[in-house]
Amino acid sequence: MNNFVRQSLEDFLNEIAKARKNFGYPVIVAFDRKTANNVLKQEFIERYTGELFLDPMNSEVDIESGVSYHQLSDFCLDQPRLTFENADLSDSKATLMMRTVRGKQLQLSQAVGSTRRQVTRLAKASPINGPSLVFDIELKNTRNAVSENGRVYFSYAAGTNYAFYGGTTQFELDKLGLHFKEYFEAYTVQPGQREIIEYTLGELANLADLILKPKDFKIRTHGAPGTRLRNQASFGDGAVVLFVELEGFDSSNAIPPDRNDKLPYLLPDGYSANVLINSDFITKNLIIKQLKESASGISLLDWAPLLTGGLGYRATGELSIDGFEFYDNAGPNVTTFTKYNATYTCPPNMTQPKILE
């Protein structure tokens, strides 16, 4: 496969059919950068009705003590955006960016021995030319969990490598970036303010009447093919991948993959989201549960894993199938349809295996 082109759906299905790729988890969920950023943008807009947004920043940054200063006046940041140019399943980094859409930035200098400051640079930010704040989020170490309402979230204050591109040197970029980190951290200690710097990536419903009830998860990021190449249209593309543990499924030995080559990129060409469900979970918690609760007359006795990877059940009783239609491709442009009526009977005094995969 071309390293810069996503797989077709057919190629993707053929690849995951070769071997199980669930790594011991019942559910794996993936969604792409555009989907994640649309969610973040919508939440950013909704926050203005609930007054859950950052206050304009008015502060001074001591770049070089007694010599150089930056004053930030009425500074406002827009919505967060995720990119995945540094994403790798081994460290699960994502890059977060916010642009300055309003405010003034003054750079001041003060001669040694003088008490007067001199303005050396003045910049006014707008949605067109505002400098950006960029930092890394290590999602696997960021505060995340399936809360009561199933929220998957991250915090502005939990990042690393903060850089604010309103300076002229790397030292200034880092110094200003650190100032924003300290600004965010102040929200974590103020009562009722933490949620201002926390944003939702998605929700996992955890309701009492659902069969799929998440109890925990591991979150990773996966760069798309060509994500690291700035001259490619796919630069920064990638997926957020959730490895979800469910109630009623033993995930004690589940471990997410630690290398990109252990997991195919889960979003084929043209797809923005994907959900993989473990076939063992479907069999035991959906199919078998439904058979036990139905009036089919089948009694399931026990089960065991088979060498084929499926589950073998011993059963006794009778199951009738009426009016079942199936089709078979008998050749080019020829399809046959068959009306199927059948009764499966397991004599009361003996058992036979039924394979459910």
Give residue ranges: language-model regions:
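Hydrophobic membrane/lipid-contacting segments
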Residues: 2-182, 186, 190, 194-357
